[in-house]
């Protein structure tokens, strides 16, 4: 029964793995709900900042703020690449990196260089492995990242845009659609689009004029940074919700596969045991007949 013992050992091994994947599935489900709630709570702030900034930009057209310049010749681009710090989340990071690298290659074919800020160790390792120009990064952000962890890398990139050392900035991340679907997204963060500060931007429901202290221009300059930071944080929240959803689905699939493997191994074990019993009975019958 040496074969039978080996099969039982395999069954116990798969059962232990199944317990781990089941626990990871449950943890991911809990974390996904929390990240979804954080994502939902962050939206009203970002929308209100965008509305006030749009109102100020439309009433102060001669603002002279570099971050609001809309037309530039593109010579150098920046990327904010958001990925997860951990794996076991299906093809989530691979899909984002595929979209990101395709855009980088397209720019390189035009002779345009890139500068990259990475949030998440998976994206950072991928960029370093192929020799891309990573200028700043932040990893090990945890389940509830603080804005302070993002400010250093973001400030450096925004300052380079203000100095005309970078002419466009892309934001790349995994967008959360629903539990079963996450999609890689690439958005132009800078220059800020017409849908944010142009005629198609959201309008305030009130028609009266506002009085700003110290000045409308000072408030606008402050709000532009806060708006950009809120967009990046919202993308990070989306990416984290996508990560937990993808991990939950991946761990459920692994748990189900482990269950199927256990069933197959039990069937093989029962067949081998039945064959061994049949052989023993045949030997007993043959021995009795010989006597």
UniProtKB/Swiss-Prot annotation:
Gene3D superfamilies to which the protein is assigned, alphabetical: 3.40.1380.10, ATP synthase, gamma subunit, helix hairpin domain (1.10.287.80)
Bilayer disposition of the protein: Peripheral membrane protein
Keywords linked to the UniProt accession: ATP synthesis, Cell inner membrane, Cell membrane, CF(1), Hydrogen ion transport, Ion transport, Membrane, Transport
Pfam families per UniProt: ATP-synt (PF00231)
GO cellular component, one term: plasma membrane
Superkingdom classification of source: Bacteria
Entry's family note: Belongs to the ATPase gamma chain family.
GO molecular function, one term: ATP binding
Entries under InterPro entries matching the protein: ATP_synth_F1_ATPase_gsu (IPR035968), ATP_synth_F1_gsu (IPR000131), ATP_synth_F1_gsu_CS (IPR023632)
Compartment annotation: Cell inner membrane
Predominant subcellular localization, coarse grouping: membrane
One Gene Ontology biological process: proton motive force-driven ATP synthesis
Protein name stated in the entry: ATP synthase gamma chain
